[in-house]
Every structure is written in structure tokens, then in C-alpha cells.
Amino acid sequence: QDSRPCEERFGCTRYVDTSIPHIPVTAHGLKENGYATIATTNWLPYSWSINNVAFAEVMHTALSYFQAGRAEAGYKLLKSSVLDGMYLGDSPGNFGQISFYDAARGECYRDFGDPIGVASRVLIQGLFGILPDALNQQIILRPGFPDDWDKASVSTPDISYRFTRKEDTDTY
């Protein structure tokens, strides 16, 4: 677990909000909902490996939002990245390494595996909040569901749970 105070984690994500380029995720027929992916840096000049739109880095940033207590922002970035790579890209249903929004490379490396691991982590640890603590032989639940969700469920080999929200009561 991150030992930094929540305020510091929040501040780090605010840096992303204010200083890292946000690129709108748009498509014909996609309802405008403020979806956006991000570049890895704001450094110039733009060059390969300096300012990419890389799925693994975007997913790590989404996880950072969840870890900072900013579930809505984490979910929005997660969903934006899923839309970008799995629906709008040239290889539907796949996470490649680089988004087609990347100015230098465009969509490439469709069989690159590192985004899959971190996408799984942001889904399980960020959205569903399943945080294993092996040293203490426990699993901590700290879900990051969006405010407008009224139900969700997850099942892994180690844990399964259901979530429901009715008015002001969340039940797990």
C-alpha cells in the first residue's frame, strides 16, 4: 500500500490534470462524454519514447487516480482507454502498445503484452478495489465504483463479491 498521505497522492493526480496533454477520444456515434486519453509527458520536442500515447502508461495513471481516492477520474480514464484501444482501434478487442492517437507512431505493436497486465490490475485493484495483503493473510476491499453505479460483481479464483447501492446504502 502507498504510505504517502492522501493529499500528496491527490496532488500528484492534479498534476496530470493540469500539466499532461489530454487527447479527446471521439468517434462517429460515440456520445460526447468527455472521454480523453493522455500523453505520457509534456516534454518537447516530440519524439519517439518521450511523448507517446501508450496504453500501459495510461492504465497506470488510471490506477493512480483510484489509489488517490479519485474513483470518478480513474474510471473515466480507464473507460477512455478501453474505448480507444478495444473499440476504436484497428484491432478491436485488443490492447496494443501504442494508441492511434500517438502522433509519432500511430497505432502499433498490437501483440505487445504489457498493457494487459496493468489493465487487469486497474480493473481488479482500482475499480473493484481488491487489494491483497499477503503478509497479513488478508484481502482489503476498497472499491472505486463510479457514483452512478448501483450494482457490480466480480469473481476471481480467490474472491468473489457483489455490490448493490440503494439510495444511501451500499451493500457488499
Residue spans for each PLM region:
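Carbohydrate-binding surface patches
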Residues: 148-172
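Short amphipathic alpha-helical patches
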Residues: 101-105, 146-151
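Carbohydrate-binding surfaces of carbohydrate-active enzymes
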Residues: 135-138
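Active-site core of glycosidic bond-cleaving carbohydrate-active enzymes
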Residues: 1-122, 126-132
